[in-house]
């Protein structure tokens, strides 16, 4: 089975040694082919675009989406992420590909460089809403 993992820095394995991300671990521990299509800093809109340009052309059996935290950090809302996830699910179903939605863990802190543009209280509330959704 071929599974394309579409996501942001959590999928990429940001700040981990090469070969130590969760997609790499799944490739070693399961008989399936897991393709890492993560891009650090990507938003849910970016995932939606890359679904058509990078994931579906690979003819996967399944696409696993995990993202939305970057949208929430930048906008303080989960609305854009929810809309993009729904669109990705519909596009996968239309293409005959099984969609799987991964739930990112709730954000508790933000990088120092984001603090001037991120309302942490609002982002935490939106992140919790997104996880519950």
Task: Please identify what each model-predicted range represents.
Residues 43-44, 115:
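A short linear-motif detector with a strong N-terminal bias
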């Amino acid at each position: 089975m071929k599974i394309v993992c579409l996501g942001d820095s959590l999928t990429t394995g940001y700040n981990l040694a090469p070969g130590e991300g969760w997609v790499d671990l799944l490739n070693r521990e399961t008989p399936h082919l897991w393709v890492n299509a993560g891009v650090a800093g990507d938003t849910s809109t970016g995932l939606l675009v890359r679904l058509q340009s990078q994931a579906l052309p690979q003819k996967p059996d399944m696409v696993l989406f995990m993202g939305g935290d970057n949208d929430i950090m930048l906008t303080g809302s989960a609305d854009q992420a929810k809309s993009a996830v729904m669109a990705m699910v519909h596009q996968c179903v239309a293409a005959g590909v099984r969609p799987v939605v991964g739930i990112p863990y709730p954000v508790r802190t933000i990088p120092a460089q984001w603090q001037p543009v991120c309302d942490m209280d609002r982002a935490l509330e939106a992140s919790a809403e997104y996880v519950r959704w």
